[in-house]
A protein has these predicted regions:
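Small cysteine-rich, disulfide-bonded extracellular modules of the LU/uPAR three-finger superfamily
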Residues: 1-106, 113-152
Length: 152
């Protein structure tokens, strides 16, 4: 089995039902509070992909100073559009500080922990291990075609 980079198929339908709020300013909701999102790391032997509907500890990394469920994504750039693409990117890199993750991992699941841990997207990268170090996933430029979340 292998992890596959993809936007969760369930996320696409959930957007139409207003489950996910990436912005504190949302005219579609009466309460202007952004949802809380997290980023969990997954083993290279796991299977997270477009069919992943929610966060699960199955296949998630374990190790020193890594908290099950991953890290909280502190904030997102305001969702916007350009041409026919809607997009947003977290405002800061994903940083896992002083961790030891001895088993190879190669994916991060972004999920909405305010809405039943619903999956948003899976992002893959080269297989990694970390020994008493900081692992950082640098965020892409927040623009159409490069943002972490692109809906075309």
């Amino acid at each position: 089995m292998a992890n596959t980079q993809a936007m969760a198929t369930s996320f696409k339908g959930e957007l139409l039902n207003a489950y996910h709020n990436f912005s504190a300013t949302n005219p579609a909701r009466t309460v202007n509070t952004a949802d809380s999102f997290k980023a969990a790391l997954y083993l290279a032997s796991a299977t997270v992909n477009a069919t992943t509907t929610a966060y699960s500890a199955t296949g998630e990394v374990t190790g020193t100073n890594y908290t099950a469920g991953g890290i909280t994504i502190t904030s997102w750039n305001a969702p916007t559009t350009s041409g026919t693409t809607g997009y947003t990117t977290p405002t800061a890199s994903f940083t896992y500080t002083t961790v030891t993750l001895s088993t190879a991992f190669d994916a991060v699941l972004v999920y909405n922990n305010s809405q039943g841990n619903r999956a948003v997207s899976v992002h893959t990268f080269g297989s990694q291990t970390v020994t008493a170090g900081t692992f950082t996933l640098t965020m892409p430029t927040n623009a159409a075609g490069t943002a972490l979340i692109n809906i075309a």
